[in-house]
Amino acid sequence: MNKPMLMLITFATSLLAQTNKASTGLKTDQSFNNSLSESVKLKEIADIYPTNTNFLTGIGIVAGLAGKGDSIKQKDLIIKILEENNIINEIGSNNIESKNIALVNVSLQVKGNTIKGSKHKACVASILDSKDLTNGILLKTNLKNKEGEIIAIASGITQPNNKLKGSGYTIDSVIINENQNINHSYNIILKKGNYTLINRIHKILTSKKINNKIKSDSTIEIEAKNISLLEEIENIKIETNPKILIDKKNGIILASENAKIGTFTFSIEKDNQNIFLSKNNKTTIQVNSMKLNEFILKNSNNLSNKELIQIIQAAQKINKLNGELILEEIDGNQN
């Protein structure tokens, strides 16, 4: 029976060394090579978000509801809102009495700074007893911040918000008309928390004289006053932990250059195909500290891939493996 193919990746030279290639025609997808890379761009392992969020709200009127609007019970309140928004002259009393308009709450959440002239989507919700706001027209509505300052103007056609259950609606045309106090703080948030990695990023940022503060195992707060600095931070190269990928089914081992195995003794029962020898031939193996790639190359002629994988997994269990062990099945049909 042919021995399964053994593949080693050495990233120092960016070459793929293959042994026993003739035994299988298995191909590995480039994504596996990339996933084992020890040097990645920050944007591949983290996202950058503004630290501040602005909440803007306002009360407005949706017109053109053709009998599906608010009842006349709240006529006085509706008139008051129309006066506050300086649109009382645009709405006749007939529209109120014929249930053609509705009193609504308009809310907008802006992550990051509110920039004059920028356009946003807002949520619209009925306040009183209107039945349906679909295809209504939101008249000009002032949106204010928590200090009561008018920051944006909302208007446009209301559409059902399919992402929300219930009676939520949206409009696409909210225009910011005032800049608020500009905030230059952002959070770098790792996709997977790791104190070692977060401290490594902190040291790199500090060496580049970028103000930063570790907030948790997954978050660093930074100060960036321009887009070019954010772009530079996104593309910073980060050295990640060494990785070892094992495909037990196909007998494949992929190891990044700096993955290492420590010193320990391992006892294994070798399966002999010779019927005249004992079927359970126990062998003791002395493993010396070295790079994992070197260990595999040194022992590939004497040990099967299955046995090598057993040793690597044993090393990981007793903390003698320097590298993150990943168990995955590689699809050999990919090109």
Curated annotation (Swiss-Prot):
UniProt entry keywords in alphabetical sequence: Bacterial flagellum, Periplasm, Signal
Any GO CC annotation of this UniProt entry: bacterial-type flagellum basal body, distal rod, P ring
Signal peptide (UniProt feature, chain positions): 1-17
InterPro entries reported in the protein's UniProt record: Flag_FlgI (IPR001782)
NCBIfam families assigned to the protein according to its UniProt record, in alphabetical order: PRK12706.1
Reported function: Assembles around the rod to form the L-ring and probably protects the motor/basal body from shearing forces during rotation.
Assembly description: The basal body constitutes a major portion of the flagellar organelle and consists of four rings (L,P,S, and M) mounted on a central rod.
The protein, known as: Flagellar P-ring protein
Organism: Borreliella burgdorferi (strain ZS7) (Borrelia burgdorferi)
Gene name as annotated: flgI
